[in-house]
Amino acid sequence: MKKTILVTMLFALISTFAFAAKKPKYITPVPKNGQIVIKKSQLSKDASYINYSAGGVSVQLIAVIADDNTYRLSFNTCQSCNPSPNAYFAQEGKNLVCQNCGNQFTMNDVGAASYGCNPAMIPYTQTDSELIVSTEILEKVAPAFKRWQGPVD
């Protein structure tokens, strides 16, 4: 009887840690020379949320390594649901889920297309170790984020 209780408690403890939600990773690069730089070493197959302040408006990007090991980057807003304050994506399991309409996308969909509900692609360049985004682009898209209320940390 004691052995059964001990095994049950051990299983419950292991399950709690195995299925616990991962805390999202937020990165706030310091703008320099008209661009922000995201270190590839900071990214993984889980979504990282890149924060930028455009004149007090929070503009957020999603950065991830796709299944084919390419780096993906997009704006963290649902194009169909914008300007809803909840038009942003949160990772649930291996998918990104719009917090307004509930549409789901895989990490491979990040930055892949710009239509409908997909996480909107953003132009960027990359080096062997970095993804580089022009702050001019971030400033131009800031009006779409005026009502956005996604988490930033």
Where are the language model's segments positioned?
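Positively charged n-region of N-terminal signal peptides that target proteins for export
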Residues: 1-4
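Bacterial N-terminal signal peptides
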Residues: 8-15
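Residue-level signal for mature regions of secreted extracellular proteins and peptides
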Residues: 13, 71, 91-94, 110
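Sec/Tat signal peptide C-region and signal peptidase I cleavage site
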Residues: 16-20
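N-terminal pre-ligand scaffold of iron-sulfur
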Residues: 21-90, 124-153
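Iron-sulfur (Fe-S) cluster-binding segments and ferredoxin-like electron-carrier domains
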Residues: 84-92, 103-112
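Short cysteine/histidine-rich metal-coordination sites, predominantly Zn2+-binding motifs
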Residues: 92-101, 112-122
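A contiguous, mid-protein "functional segment" used to position or interact
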Residues: 105-107, 115-133
